[in-house]
Amino acid sequence: MEAPRSAPRERERARTTSGSDQVHSWILVTSQVLSAAWRIARAFVMTTLSPLSATFSYFRSLYLYLGHQLKWWIGYLQRKFKRNLSVEAEVDLLSYCAREWKGEAPRARLMRKAYEELFWRHHIKCVRAVKRDNYDALRSVLFQIFSQGLSFPSWMKEKDIVKLPEKLLFSQGCNWIQQYSFGPEKYTGSNVFGKLRKCVELLKLQWTEFSGMRDHHKRGSMCNSLFSDAILECKLYEALKFLMLYQVTEAYEQMKTNKVIPSLFRLLFSRESSPDPLSFMMNHLNSIGDTCGLDQIDMFILGYSLQVKIKVFRLFKFNSRDFAVCYPEEPLREWPEISLLTENGHHYHIPVF
C-alpha cells in the first residue's frame, strides 16, 4: 500500500530537480553569452578607441609643440624689431616718482619730496628715463643737444674737428694717444687714429644734420632712431670723450706757456691722478663707458668742451645748497642750458619742463 503513494512524490521530486537543472543551465548559458558579448564589445571598443587615443595624443603633442614654437618666434620677432630706445618717452614726473619710490623708508620720503620740489618750484612736468650704464651722462647731454637742435660750439666752427686726432699726434707730439681706450672695447693699437677720426666724423655729421633741422617733431623722430642704435651711440660718446681730451691737452699746452686758463683745468691738473693729459686719459677718461661714468670735474670739462651750461638737479642733496649745481659754474658766455637730474650722483635722467 505504501509503494503506490510514494511514486508520485518521486516523480514530483524528479520534475523539480529537472526544472532546477534547466534553470541553472539557462543562467549559465546566458552568463556565458553575456560574458562573451562583453569581451567582444570591449575588444571592439578598445580596437576602435586605441587609434582615436593615439590620434588625440599625437595632436595634443603637436599642439603643444607648435604653441611653444609660436611663442618663441613671437618673442624673437619682438626682440628683433622692437626699438631698444636708450632714452625713453616722456612720462609724468610725479607718476614716475610714485612708481619708483614707494613705502615709508627715509630715502623714499626724501625722493618724493625732491620730486615734488622739481614739479612745483622748478616747473618740471615730465621726465625721460635714460638707460643705466656708464655712458648715461654723455647720453643725456648729447640727446638734448640734438633734440633741441643746438648749434656747434664756436671753437668747433673754427676748426675741422675731424682732423684733431692727427693734429694731436703730428703737431703736438702726443704719441701717447695710441693708448686711448674705447670704453668697454678697450681697443688700443696703431689704428686708434683711424677709429677716432671715424667717431669724430660721425659726431660732426649728426650734429650738423640736427642743428640744421627746424622741424621739432622730425628732430624727435630722428633722435629716437639714432638713440636706438647702440653701435652708433658708442661712437658718438667716444667722440665726446676725445673732444674733452683735446680741450685738456690745449689747456695744458697753454698752462706751460704761462697763459691764463679756466680754473677748472687748474683744478684738474692739481690732482695727483691727472697732472697732465696722459694721466687724465689713463686714469679717468679711458674708464668712462667701461667701469665708471663722469665725475664732477669731468662734467665741468664736458660742459666747457661743448659750450653748454649743464644744470644738474641732485635729488639726494635735497634741502641743501648742492641740490642744483651747474657745470661750469660760471659759463664764459651766454651758453645754452640743458638740465639733468640724478637720484644718486651716478646715473642721470632728462627732466622736461
Curated annotation (Swiss-Prot):
This protein's GO CC annotations: cytoplasm; cytoplasmic side of endoplasmic reticulum membrane; nuclear envelope
Residue ranges constituting the OTU domain according to the UniProt record: 125-353
Gene Ontology biological-process annotations: protein linear deubiquitination
InterPro entries in the record: FAM105, OTULINL
Main location: cytoplasm
Chain intervals for the UniProt region annotation (Required for membrane binding): 1-80
Membrane among keywords: yes
Annotated compartments: Cytoplasm; Endoplasmic reticulum membrane; Nucleus envelope
Keywords annotated in UniProt: Cytoplasm, Endoplasmic reticulum, Membrane, Nucleus
Source taxon at top rank: Eukaryota
Pfam families assigned: Peptidase_C101 (PF16218)
Keyword Transport set for record: no
Membrane topology, as annotated: Peripheral membrane protein
The record's note on its domains: The N-terminal region that precedes the OTU domain mediates interaction with cellular membranes.
Protein purpose: Lacks deubiquitinase activity.
Complexes and interactors: Does not bind ubiquitin or ubiquitin-like proteins.
Record-stated family: Belongs to the peptidase C65 family. Otulin subfamily.
Protein name per the record: Inactive ubiquitin thioesterase OTULINL
